[in-house]
Regions:
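Hydrophobic/aromatic-rich transmembrane helices and adjacent perimembrane loops
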Residues: 135, 273-289
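A cytosolic-side transmembrane-helix exit/cap motif
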Residues: 120-123, 169-175, 279-282, 297-306, ...
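Primarily membrane-embedded glycan-assembly and transfer machineries that use lipid-linked glycans
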Residues: 1-118, 144-274
Length: 356
C-alpha cells in the first residue's frame, strides 16, 4: 500500500520547479525535496529510504529510553509494547510516512542528555522535515524556541537557494498549499473513515440526509470551513497561557501539557492519519519512567494504551482487510481520544482553577 509521503516525494523530487510550478501545489518543506532529489539521483529506491528511517527511528527511541531510564529491561519492554501493541510503526512503514521519524527525533531530544544547542539543531532539522511539529517546540522554553526558529529559517532559505527557487515566493506557495488542504472529502470515504480528527465526523454528520439542507447543516459546514483557524486559535491560546505562567521556562516534564497538545493535534488538525497518535509515546514514557507519583497517572496510562490498542486484532486470523481494519480501529481510537481530551481539559483547567 505504498502511497504515503515517500512515494509523493519521489515524484516531486523529479520536478525542476517544485515550488513555482503553476500546475502543481505542494506543501512539503524544501529540505525534504532536496534530500530526495539527491537520493533519487543516486539511483536508490525509495523503499530503502523508507525502511532506513523506520529502523533508525526505533534506534532513537530505544537509545533515549535507555539513557533516561538506565534500565535496559524497561527500555526493551517499552519499545516492544509500542511497536507490537500499537499499529503506528507497521502502518507508517506500510504507508511510507515520515511522521514516525519526526516523532522519534522529538522523543530523542526530550529523553537523551543533550545540550541546548544540540536540542535546537535537532528540533530545527525536525521542523525542516515536518513543519507541523512546530506546535510542540514552545514546551522546551523560550531560549530553545528562539534558537530553533533562527536555525530553521536558515535551513529553509539555504534549501530554497540550493533548489534554485526564489525564497519568498516559494515559501508563500508552500504555505498556501499547506493551508488549502481539502482532506477529508466525500470523494474518498476510506480516508474519511480513517481520519482520527473531529472534522471528519463533522463532515460526515453535515452530509446526512436529514441534516444536509437544514440550518444546522449550514452551521456545521461553517465550522468545518474554519477548522484551521479553530485549531491554530486553540494552540495560540494554550501557549499564551502556559508561557505567561512559566515565564518562558521549560515545560518538558509537564505530562498533562504534553497530553493536551498531543490530543489537540490529533483531534483538531485538519486530517489525522492512523499514525498521528504515536505522539502520545512521549507522555506515556514520562508517566511510566517517573520516579515520583503523577496525578492520575494510572488513568492516563490506561487511556493512552486504549488509543494504541489494536482492537480488531483477532480478525487477522481469519480475514484481514487493511481498510476495514483501519476504519474500526480509527473510530475506537477517536472515541477514546475524545474521552481523554475531556478528562485532561477538566484536570488542567477546572481543577486548577478550583485549587487556586
Amino acid at each position: 500500500h505504498y502511497f504515503g509521503d515517500t512515494s509523493e516525494l519521489a515524484y516531486l523530487s523529479k520536478l525542476e520547479d517544485p515550488y513555482t510550478n503553476e500546475n502543481f501545489q505542494q506543501s512539503y518543506p524544501p529540505l525534504l525535496i532536496l534530500l530526495f532529489k539527491n537520493f533519487i539521483s543516486s539511483g536508490q529506491h525509495v523503499l530503502i529510504f523508507n525502511i532506513f528511517i523506520h529502523v533508525f527511528s526505533l534506534l532513537l527511541i530505544f537509545s533515549s529510553a535507555l539513557k533516561s531510564s538506565k534500565d535496559i529491561d524497561f527500555a526493551v519492554k517499552f519499545l516492544l509494547f509500542f511497536v507490537v501493541c500499537s499499529k503506528f510503526f507497521i502502518y507508517s512503514l506500510d504507508r511510507g510516512n515520515i511522521e514516525f521519524f519526526i516523532i522519534s527525533i522529538l522523543f530523542f531530544v526530550l529523553f537523551f542528555d543533550l545540550t541546548i544547542i544540540q536540542k535546537a539543531l535537532l528540533l530545527s532539522f525536525a521542523i525542516s522535515l515536518k513543519p507541523s511539529i512546530l506546535i510542540f517546540i514552545p514546551i522546551f522554553g523560550f531560549k530553545i524556541l528562539s534558537i530553533t526558529s533562527i536555525i530553521t529559517f536558515f535551513i529553509y532559505s539555504i534549501s530554497f537557494l540550493w533548489l534554485k527557487e526564489p525564497i519568498f515566493s516559494s515559501f508563500l506557495n508552500m504555505v498556501n498549499a499547506f493551508s488549502s488542504t481539502k482532506f477529508p472529502t466525500l470523494h474518498n470515504w476510506q480516508l474519511l473513515e480513517q481520519d482520527l480528527s473531529i472534522w471528519g465526523k463533522i463532515y460526515w454528520l453535515r452530509h446526512l440526509d436529514s441534516i444536509v439542507e437544514s440550518s444546522f447543516g449550514s452551521f456545521l459546514q461553517s465550522i468545518y470551513n474554519n477548522r484551521s483557524i479553530i485549531f491554530y486559535l486553540v494552540i495560540l491560546i494554550t501557549w499564551s497561557i502556559f508561557i505567561s505562567k512559566s515565564k518562558g521556562k521549560s515545560l518538558e516534564n509537564n505530562v498533562e501539557l504534553w497530553i493536551f497538545i498531543s490530543l489537540t493535534s490529533i483531534l483538531l488538525f485538519s486530517f489525522s492519519g492512523v499514525y498521528k497518535s504515536a505522539i502520545l509515546i512521549i507522555p506515556l514514557f514520562i508517566l511510566m519512567n517517573s520516579s515520583k507519583p503523577i496525578r492520575n497517572e494510572n488513568l492516563y496510562i490506561f487511556l493512552i494504551a486504549m488509543i494504541f490498542l489494536q482492537v480488531p486484532i483477532f480478525r487477522h486470523m481469519f480475514n484481514f482487510d487493511i481498510y476495514s481494519d483501519l476504519s474500526i480501529w480509527s473510530f475506537f481510537s477517536f472515541a477514546v481520544s475524545l474521552i481523554f481530551y475531556s478528562v485532561i481539559i477538566n484536570n488542567i483547567v477546572f481543577k486548577v482553577e478550583r485549587n487556586e
